[in-house]
């Protein structure tokens, strides 16, 4: 949620930045109109209340002097009725303004590239060499089926499309990746480990920006009015909802493994095969709470923490700075990490690392005090995937495959796999 003062005092500047996002400005314009009406009503209400106080004093004086006060009493009744009417309108406007505020996205940071589509995202750097195969490489869904480590068919029978069973060494590979990532982030990158709830309430989904605008993308448990989490970002960020943190305790850095659940509304026909776009998938998340002046340095470090996973797995990747049109609702600046997937002959997103500045903190009321007794300020929140597990498995299967259909295990994972170096075709 944006600062109301920013909207009031820098209306045209904010409007331009939202235009750079490609946003429909209808709701934003409506905010300006309603806020103008609200200020007019406040001025009128305050004037009437002042008038009512004066009339009350005049009535008291007339009564003390045994004079007729009926006319003044009638005047005060009319004024009182008008104040009640204005107060009702003010409450209605405040409710509308709150709803509009919840629907306005974050404004891009000045370093975010201005663009009209994903084609305008800017490549920042690349790492690793794309492998040149001397045989026709298989897609990960075929590799997983042939190796008997991924089962999409029975998952479709048990549940439906966009689900998978990990089996045998496939399940062990996923578990090895989880442990490797969590160990790296907690032991070397300084994150505190968490295992969060997989269901959250509406206040939590609102705090991180999924609600009210993106409810159709979430899975709702109607009987309880709980949502299955789309990412561990939601419960971990809301861990500090309504908290006032101490400055000396910042930054707070958390890493969390969780299953994630997404309806993928609007994704019909896209990535229908394999692990790239599932309704349920595992992910290791990185979340930070920092002082405002530290958040952009923190973003670079957080992005580097996610990159380190790919480097140690020796998977080729690139980093993109996302343009204004491809930024997402809550971010002021976002980097995407894309890993090379041979079956697509392209890089595919495997992590997003974002600085939300105070956008989420305002929605979730997460603040800190610089000194005891000082006025609380909003923290800046950041998060990133470190990494998405299904896409990491897909990248390993495809990039580490051999001509005989086997898949080598990255060296960094072999200790987590009990020394297993290769997944071979069943005999």
Curated annotation (Swiss-Prot):
Notes on the domains: Consists of two distinct domains, a catalytic core and a N-terminal extension that is involved in tRNA binding.
Family: Belongs to the class-II aminoacyl-tRNA synthetase family. Type-1 seryl-tRNA synthetase subfamily.
Lineage: Bacteria, Bacillati, Bacillota, Bacilli, Bacillales
Name assigned to this protein: Serine--tRNA ligase
Keyword terms: Aminoacyl-tRNA synthetase, ATP-binding, Cytoplasm, Ligase, Nucleotide-binding, Protein biosynthesis
Residues annotated to bind ATP: 262-264, 349-352
InterPro entries: aa-tRNA-synt_IIb, aa-tRNA-synth_II, aa-tRNA-synth_II/BPL/LPL, Ser-tRNA-ligase_type_1, Ser-tRNA-synth_1_N, SerRS_1_N_sf, SerRS_core, tRNA-bd_arm
Pfam families: Seryl_tRNA_N, tRNA-synt_2b
Record function comment: Catalyzes the attachment of serine to tRNA(Ser). Is also able to aminoacylate tRNA(Sec) with serine, to form the misacylated tRNA L-seryl-tRNA(Sec), which will be further converted into selenocysteinyl-tRNA(Sec).
Any one GO cellular component localisation term in the record: cytoplasm
Gene Ontology biological-process annotations: selenocysteine biosynthetic process; seryl-tRNA aminoacylation
Protein's cellular compartments: Cytoplasm
UniProt subunit comment: Homodimer. The tRNA molecule binds across the dimer.
Main location: cytoplasm
Source species: Listeria monocytogenes serovar 1/2a (strain ATCC BAA-679 / EGD-e)
Catalytic activity: tRNA(Ser) + L-serine + ATP = L-seryl-tRNA(Ser) + AMP + diphosphate + H(+); tRNA(Sec) + L-serine + ATP = L-seryl-tRNA(Sec) + AMP + diphosphate + H(+)
PANTHER family named among the record's database cross-references: SERINE--TRNA LIGASE (PTHR43697:SF1), SERYL-TRNA SYNTHETASE (PTHR43697)
Pathway info: Aminoacyl-tRNA biosynthesis; selenocysteinyl-tRNA(Sec) biosynthesis; L-seryl-tRNA(Sec) from L-serine and tRNA(Sec): step 1/1
Enzyme Commission number, as recorded: 6.1.1.11
NCBIfam families: serS
């Amino acid at each position: 949620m944006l600062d109301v003062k920013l909207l009031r005092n820098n209306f045209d500047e904010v409007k331009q930045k939202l235009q750079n996002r490609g946003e429909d400005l209808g709701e934003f314009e409506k905010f300006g109109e309603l806020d103008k009406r609200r200020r007019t009503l406040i001025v009128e209400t305050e004037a009437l209340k002042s008038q009512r106080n004066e009339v009350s004093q005049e009535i008291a004086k007339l009564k003390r002097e045994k004079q007729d006060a009926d006319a003044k009493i009638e005047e005060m009744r009319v004024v009182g009725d008008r104040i009640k009417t204005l107060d009702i309108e003010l409450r209605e406007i405040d409710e509308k303004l709150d709803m509009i505020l919840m629907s306005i996205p974050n404004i891009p940071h000045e370093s975010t590239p201005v663009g009209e589509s994903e084609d305008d995202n800017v490549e920042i750097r690349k790492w690793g060499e794309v492998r040149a195969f001397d045989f026709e490489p298989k897609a990960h869904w075929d590799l997983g089926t042939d190796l008997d480590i991924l089962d999409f068919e029975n998952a479709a029978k048990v549940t439906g499309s966009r689900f998978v069973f990990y089996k045998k060494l496939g399940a062990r590979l996923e578990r090895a990746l989880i442990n490797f990532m969590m160990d790296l982030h907690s032991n070397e990158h300084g994150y505190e480990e968490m295992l969060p709830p997989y269901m959250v309430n509406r206040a939590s989904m609102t705090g991180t920006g999924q609600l009210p605008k993106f409810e159709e993308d979430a899975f709702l448990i109607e009987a309880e009015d709980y949502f299955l989490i789309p990412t561990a970002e939601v419960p971990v960020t809301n861990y500090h909802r309504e908290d006032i943190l101490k400055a000396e305790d910042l930054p707070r850095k958390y890493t969390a493994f969780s299953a994630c659940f997404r309806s993928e509304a609007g994704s019909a026909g896209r990535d229908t095969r394999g692990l790239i776009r599932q309704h349920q998938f595992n992910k290791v998340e990185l979340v930070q709470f920092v002082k405002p002046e530290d958040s952009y340095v923190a973003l670079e470090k957080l992005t580097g923490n996610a990159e380190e996973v790919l480097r140690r797995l020796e998977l080729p990747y690139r980093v993109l700075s996302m343009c204004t049109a491809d930024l997402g609702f809550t971010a002021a600046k976002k980097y995407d990490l894309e890993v090379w997937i041979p079956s697509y002959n392209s890089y595919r997103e495997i992590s997003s690392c974002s600085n939300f500045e105070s956008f989420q903190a305002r929605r979730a009321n997460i603040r800190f005090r610089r000194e005891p007794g000082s006025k609380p300020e909003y923290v800046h929140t950041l998060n990133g995937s470190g990494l998405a597990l299904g896409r990491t498995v897909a990248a390993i299967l495809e990039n580490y495959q051999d001509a005989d259909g086997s898949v080598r295990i990255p060296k960094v994972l072999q200790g987590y796999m009990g020394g297993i170096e290769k997944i071979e075709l069943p005999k």
